[in-house]
């Protein structure tokens, strides 16, 4: 019995770490994963050193850009497909249909390719050719359609639904109102944050588009902490959610726009609905603050972030300042800047958006594109 116990202990120790030929300790805690879908999640939680020192707090950011598809949306993509499989709506050789303008489509393309499903994407025809080409490269069938409001039957989401209904063995995954999206973050992202912080966090903040990330993580952290952990919405210009929360639940007509993509909303989605009333507040983050933080994170932290990630970091900084020194605030780095570099680091684009002067002089060296 003793020898068996020792053997089990030694085996566990071997799994947890190994010596490399170069005397570097190499972790083997996770071992290999079985295919792309098992590589989704378990992303690092990074302490942003400069901002943490500046605020006297711990500002922690979850590196979702390290998912296989490059964004937090990989989690939702996997869960909406798994949900369709579990409910018998999707069988081998079937077709997944979604209306998406961005990262959810890329996540679905990776998941569907790995599982052997066909993927059809409807998106507004305002999207870049590069994004369309990437989805097609990943095996998706892409239909760019005129950009119209959600209440118009020709909206890209409604076209996606009708396309799925016209096929056998097909499912419209409906990322905005399919609560499997929220469940992905209740079952994965939330528990990961809780474990990575040892439960020692004071607040969480992030922006929202479908509502799944904010709602799912908020639900889990409030349940795990007995309501102690606060949660704040970070909202870009052009979204109605900040005013909805500040007014106590009054929806106004959406107006304005933002440089951010995939976040902001004109309605309360089914993913957000269960948890919007439990939020502790909201912050409206200007494009000027967002673009400056993109450049700051690159310069100070070596992090190459997309606009929604930078907006989240601004919000985390403001929440930390609100809570005071010694607080721990967690946010989400939704994706990197790789898909947006031709704009975010372009002098002409920044000038066209009136954002050139938002970049501090010492950071202008990163404006490397004409």
UniProtKB/Swiss-Prot annotation:
GO MF annotation list: cysteine synthase activity; cysteine synthase activity, acting on O-succinyl-L-serine
CDD domains to which the protein is assigned, alphabetical: CBS_like (cd01561)
Residues making up the signal peptide according to the UniProt record: none
Residue positions binding pyridoxal 5'-phosphate: 103, 209-213, 308
InterPro entries (alphabetical): Cys_Synth/Cystath_Beta-Synth, P-phosphate_BS, TrpB-like_PALP, TrpB-like_PALP_sf
Residues modified to N6-(pyridoxal phosphate)lysine: 73
Transit peptide: 1-16
Enzyme Commission identifier(s): 2.5.1.-, 2.5.1.47
Catalytic activity: O-succinyl-L-serine + hydrogen sulfide = L-cysteine + succinate; O-acetyl-L-serine + hydrogen sulfide = L-cysteine + acetate
GO annotation, biological process: amino acid biosynthetic process; cysteine biosynthetic process from serine
Recorded GO CC terms: cytoplasm; mitochondrion
Subcellular location: Mitochondrion
Cofactors: pyridoxal 5'-phosphate
Keywords, in A-Z order: Amino-acid biosynthesis, Cysteine biosynthesis, Mitochondrion, Pyridoxal phosphate, Transferase, Transit peptide
The protein's annotated pathway: Amino-acid biosynthesis; L-cysteine biosynthesis; L-cysteine from L-serine: step 2/2
Primary subcellular site in the record, as a coarse category: mitochondrion
Tree of life domain: Eukaryota
Coiled-coil intervals, chain numbering: none
Summary of the function given for this chain in its UniProt record: Catalyzes the conversion of O-succinyl-L-serine into cysteine, the last step in the cysteine biosynthesis pathway. Can also use O-acetyl-L-serine.
UniProt record similarity statement: Belongs to the cysteine synthase/cystathionine beta-synthase family.
Name the UniProt record assigns to this protein: Cysteine synthase 1
Organism of origin: Emericella nidulans (strain FGSC A4 / ATCC 38163 / CBS 112.46 / NRRL 194 / M139) (Aspergillus nidulans)
């Amino acid at each position: 019995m003793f020898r068996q116990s020792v053997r089990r202990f030694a085996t566990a120790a071997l799994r947890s770490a190994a010596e490399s030929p170069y005397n570097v300790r190499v972790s083997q805690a996770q071992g290999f994963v079985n295919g792309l879908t098992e590589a989704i999640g378990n992303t690092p939680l990074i302490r942003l050193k400069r901002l943490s020192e500046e605020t006297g707090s711990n500002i922690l950011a979850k590196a979702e850009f390290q998912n296989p598809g490059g964004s937090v949306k990989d989690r939702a993509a996997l869960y909406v497909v798994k949900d369709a499989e579990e409910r018998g709506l999707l069988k081998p050789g079937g077709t997944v249909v979604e209306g998406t303008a961005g990262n959810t489509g890329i996540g679905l393309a990776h998941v569907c390719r790995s599982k052997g499903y066909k993927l059809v994407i409807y998106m507004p025809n305002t999207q870049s050719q590069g994004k369309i080409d990437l989805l097609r490269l990943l095996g998706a069938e892409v239909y760019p359609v005129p950009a119209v409001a959600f209440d118009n039957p020709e909206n890209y989401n409604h076209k996606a639904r009708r396309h799925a209904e016209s096929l056998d063995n097909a499912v419209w995954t409906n990322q905005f109102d399919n609560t499997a999206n929220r469940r992905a973050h209740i079952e994965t992202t939330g528990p990961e944050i809780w474990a990575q912080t040892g439960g020692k966090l004071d607040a969480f903040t992030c922006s929202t588009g479908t509502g799944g990330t904010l709602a799912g993580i908020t639900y889990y952290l409030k349940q795990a902490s007995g309501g102690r952990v606060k949660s704040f919405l970070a909202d870009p210009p052009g979204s109605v959610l900040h005013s909805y929360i500040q007014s106590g639940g009054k929806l106004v007509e959406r107006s304005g726009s933002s440089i951010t993509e995939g976040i902001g909303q004109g309605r309360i989605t089914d993913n957000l609905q269960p948890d919007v009333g439990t939020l502790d507040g909201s912050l409206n983050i200007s494009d000027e603050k967002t673009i400056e933080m993109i450049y700051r994170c690159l310069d100070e932290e070596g992090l190459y972030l997309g606009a929604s990630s930078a907006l989240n970091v601004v919000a985390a900084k403001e929440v930390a300042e609100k809570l005071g020194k010694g607080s721990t605030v967690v946010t989400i780095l939704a994706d990197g800047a790789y898909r947006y570099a031709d704009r975010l680091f372009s002098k002409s684009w920044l000038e066209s958006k009136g954002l050139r002067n938002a970049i501090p002089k010492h950071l202008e060296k990163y404006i490397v594109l004409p």
